[in-house]
């Protein structure tokens, strides 16, 4: 049975790490007033909370990206019956974009998000921010800023629940199921 177990990660510390890293990176690279996009669902929760800790770095409303139609596994896992469209209340063309995800694992979610972003236009740059990063990349995608690196066994999965309160849990996957 796959019973989620709470993970003792200090969510506030993860957000402080992520916000500090993003503020520093944007200042070092002189990227003023970037737009922020959260990947539905967990990345949106992270981005919403992160916006409050970024020293007015982002002035546009938060963009929401639903990558359901861009996933490379929907033929295997099926489509969610009520897919909401993406909402980008700004043009991505020639903009510096901060793309936010909750957990970076295989890289496939980020690949799908990048494909969708480029369908809206060609950004000047994309900075990837992840609250948690774990090993297991299947694609050559790395986060630019990370709140925490988490070491998990191959049969473990981390999940963010929320939005209030945000909490991580680890689910142990039985390989015989």
Swiss-Prot record:
- The answer to whether the entry has keyword Transferase is yes
Positions occupied by motif PRPP-binding? 97-109
- EC assignment: 2.4.2.9
Judged by the first EC level, this protein's enzyme class is transferase
Tell me the InterPro entries matching this sequence: PRibTrfase_dom, PRTase-like, PyrR, PyrR_bifunctional
The record's listing under CDD domains reads:
PRTases_typeI (cd06223)
Q: What function does the entry list?
A: Regulates the transcription of the pyrimidine nucleotide (pyr) operon in response to exogenous pyrimidines.
Gene that this sequence comes from: pyrR
Q: Name one GO biological process term.
A: regulation of DNA-templated transcription
Q: Which Pfam families match?
A: Pribosyltran
One annotated GO molecular function:
uracil phosphoribosyltransferase activity
Q: Which reaction does it catalyse?
A: UMP + diphosphate = 5-phospho-alpha-D-ribose 1-diphosphate + uracil
What family is this protein classified in?
Belongs to the purine/pyrimidine phosphoribosyltransferase family. PyrR subfamily.
Q: What is this protein called?
A: Bifunctional protein PyrR
- Species source reads Nitrosococcus oceani (strain ATCC 19707 / BCRC 17464 / JCM 30415 / NCIMB 11848 / C-107)
């Amino acid at each position: 049975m796959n019973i989620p177990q709470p993970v003792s990660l200090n969510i506030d510390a993860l957000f402080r790490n992520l916000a500090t890293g993003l503020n520093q990176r944007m200042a070092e690279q002189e990227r003023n007033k970037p737009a922020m996009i959260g990947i539905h669902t967990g990345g949106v929760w992270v981005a919403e909370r992160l916006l409050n800790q970024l020293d007015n770095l982002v002035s546009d409303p938060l963009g929401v990206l639903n990558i359901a139609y861009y996933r490379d596994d929907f033929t295997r896992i099926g489509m969610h019956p009520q897919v909401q469209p993406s909402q980008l209340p700004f043009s991505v063309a020639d903009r510096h974009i901060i793309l936010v995800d909750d957990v970076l694992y295989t890289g496939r979610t980020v690949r799908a998000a990048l494909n969708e972003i480029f369908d809206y236009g060609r950004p000047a740059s994309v900075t990837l921010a992840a609250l948690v990063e774990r090993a297991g990349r299947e694609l050559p995608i790395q986060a630019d800023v990370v709140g925490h690196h988490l070491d998990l066994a191959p049969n473990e999965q981390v999940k963010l629940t929320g939005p209030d309160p945000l909490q991580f849990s680890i689910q142990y996957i039985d390989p015989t199921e």
